[in-house]
Amino acid sequence: IYQIIEHLLAFEKYKKLVIYTNGMIPLKADYRDLLLNEKIVFSVTDYGDLARNTSGFVKQLEDWGCVYRAHPPEHWTDSGRIAKQHRRDDQNQKLFDECCGKNLWTLSDKGFGRCPFAVNAAHLGAFDFADDSVVAVGDAEKLKKYVVDQNFLTACDLCNGRAFSADEITPAIQTRTPLTMEL
């Protein structure tokens, strides 16, 4: 992730790079100077008893002098269901344009995604990781096109939408049974 952060900081059009985290994975001390970049801000969601390492992570940010905001879960919408929406391209473009998650870059063990929904849907088998919704980290040419030129993702047609104006739901409720995908 540190190489990706370094790469994204090189883009002049990005004035801030917000790193959203639950603080479960501690930061590597070797990258302290990188993380002190004036463009970087951490947004740490504290899930209370569901995430035991958050307070230690926040202390690490404080000790290092990183800019951060720690907060409980907020602004959750009903956007976690994976179901084929059968939209036209222009409708998916509109959904993407209004989406609050289209720039929530998400790194996984299999690729890099524009939004956590796309990465999670790919992990659950809704589409292949070779799809346009997630790219391999090592493919610099495709990564640049993905970051700069993407109009919408294939994953958009599986998403209910995450507009800033969407109704909010109670956050962090864990399901007792797996949800089904309607593909």
Residue ranges and their predicted role:
Residues I1-E6, L27-L34:
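Distinct, well-ordered alpha-helical segments
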Residues Q3, R52-F57, D90-N92, D139:
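Well-ordered, non-membrane alpha-helical segments in soluble/globular domains
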